[in-house]
Amino acid sequence: ETFSVFNETTATFTASIDKWLPDTDGAPKWMDGPVMKLHRKDIEDEVGIDLSLKDGHPGHKHKEDMDKGSYELRVEHTQETDGAIDIDDVMGVLSLSRGIKETSGKEHELAADWNGDGLIDIDDVMGVLARSRGIRKDAEWRFHDKDSNTSLWDNASKMNKMDIELDGDNEIELTAILRGDVNASYDATVHNRAPEAAPTPNPAPLPLNNDDELIATQSVSYTH
């Protein structure tokens, strides 16, 4: 009887994270690094409740015996990304901004939309260009909920967060996207290193033509 009552008031929450685009063999690239916390919504709760690694399940974190109710899930991730964003990403976002190519999905859009305004335009090209040249060194990770096909990224607060209604055991699947990594080339075994420890990049110039945007992109990149 006690066990029954216990289950009526508590639940287990589980969240998994893998990197956008699996390996060539289709295997997920699980990520254990992101910090996930559930914050209660019925009270002021800035501390939150940490999700812990689920033994035997890479990329999965969970919390058992959670009080049922309304929560906000917040996801944070810090990881070195040196060299992951390069000229290929600049050209990729340039093609998207001009409508030459279309995004393959919400994750692709999150990678290309550098400033998070919902548009992919020359401002995003400039942002990715600055990052590829090392002018900017900030690595920003965004997360996407596979089930609802929605982004957790909130541009106003610069946080990854989503509402969770915990009325029973709940499991969600998230994808991690590195901002600016338009071709999803990030590989932790290669790029998870501090910029100063990495060799100095030799940035390739953008191919010039008569397009004003490209010429402007070149001139701005060298003056900043």
How should each PLM-predicted stretch be described?
Residues 2-218:
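Cellulosome-associated attachment modules in secreted, modular CAZymes
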Residues 195, 223-224:
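Conserved small/polar residues in nucleotide/adenosyl-binding loops
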